[in-house]
Amino acid sequence: MNRSSFDLLSTVEYGGCSAKLDPAKLSELLHDIPLPVDSRIMVDVSTHDDAGVYRLNDDTALIVTTDFFPPVCSDPYTFGRIAAANALSDVYAMGGRPLLVLNLTMFPSEGIPVEVLADILRGGQQTIDESGAFTMGGHTIDDPIPKYGLAVTGIVHPEHLVTNAGVRAGQCLVLTKPLGIGVAMAAHRLGLIGSEVYEAAIGQMCLLNRAGAELMQKYGIRGATDITGFGLLGHAKELAEASDVCLHIDSRSVPVLPECLSLLRDGCIPGATFRNLRFVGDMLRADCPTEYKMLLADAQTSGGLLMAVDADRAEDLVADLHRTGLHPFAAIIGYATDAEDAAKLIVT
């Protein structure tokens, strides 16, 4: 089947997870919104987790989440794949298995061929099929700027749930995918990188976090998150706050896409990076080169899992991630200690 050659990037200024609302503004907005109270609700928005969780019975809990955004790449089919992988990731980050999805689509009734929308949906369906979930329908509205994503329902055993609040002092931090997605995509739009770096970024965004979720269960991991629009620092902040720990990150151990550090040194810094640095604010104590600090705040789209694993099992976890053939970049990037002062993130 022929695929559309329409360039989706011509329709947007900000794409992917870099289009998220400023996290500081979002926190302020949600502050006065009343939370539901029910003994069956295991996770709500108070801990800024990746999804909500509702206990059905002693053996099953529902994971519910949604995610959508404007195009992050030119090709409609690839955009569909990335957006679906990003939405499904929230379920994986909670240690669950995606079960049912609904397509969420915003698309103009005029100006862009309808075949483009068909390609987006086909790309999304490829990734949904890879996850083992089932598409049950969706909703589409007329919007001048295309957007696509999913509402996802997953399941998890209540005793195997992974949350932001599950990190313990003494554990090591493992990251499954490289950083630099935001930098690479900005550089691509400016013509600063070749196809090799661009395709590497695309490949990471299309990759499901399924293998990482399965290994979290094998290793008994209970504290983790996925790294998306708030960058590694922003999501690590949410882990640290919910778990009441301090996270120590070795910036030079963090995996990074090719050329991204040199791009940052040369000033290719997406605007979302500064937004994310404002979000972590005084909780960050950084003693590292500027380009590494910027890398850690880079907004990721469909990024990897940041897991907290017992120190004596961290190297085995990384080896297992490598053996999947899907996560060659996986690495130990730091550790957790008891929180002692306002600094929840210490970067060296």
Curated annotation (Swiss-Prot):
The keyword Transferase applies. Its EC number is 2.7.9.3. InterPro entries: PurM-like_C_dom (IPR010918), PurM-like_C_sf (IPR036676), PurM-like_N (IPR016188), PurM-like_N_sf (IPR036921), SelD_I (IPR023061), SPS/SelD (IPR004536). GO terms for cellular component: cytoplasm. One of its GO terms (biological process) is selenocysteine biosynthetic process. Gene3D superfamilies: PurM-like C-terminal domain, PurM-like, N-terminal domain. Its cofactor is Mg(2+). Binds 1 Mg(2+) ion per monomer. GO terms for molecular function: ATP binding; magnesium ion binding; selenide, water dikinase activity. It catalyses: hydrogenselenide + ATP + H2O = selenophosphate + AMP + phosphate + 2 H(+). The active site is at C17. Mg(2+) binds at D50, D90, D226. ATP binds at K20, T47, H48, D49, D67, D90, G138, H139, T140. It is an enzyme of class 2 (transferase). Transmembrane segments: none annotated. Homodimer. Belongs to the selenophosphate synthase 1 family. Class I subfamily. Synthesizes selenophosphate from selenide and ATP. NCBIfam families: PRK00943.1, selD. This is Selenide, water dikinase. It comes from Porphyromonas gingivalis (strain ATCC 33277 / DSM 20709 / CIP 103683 / JCM 12257 / NCTC 11834 / 2561).
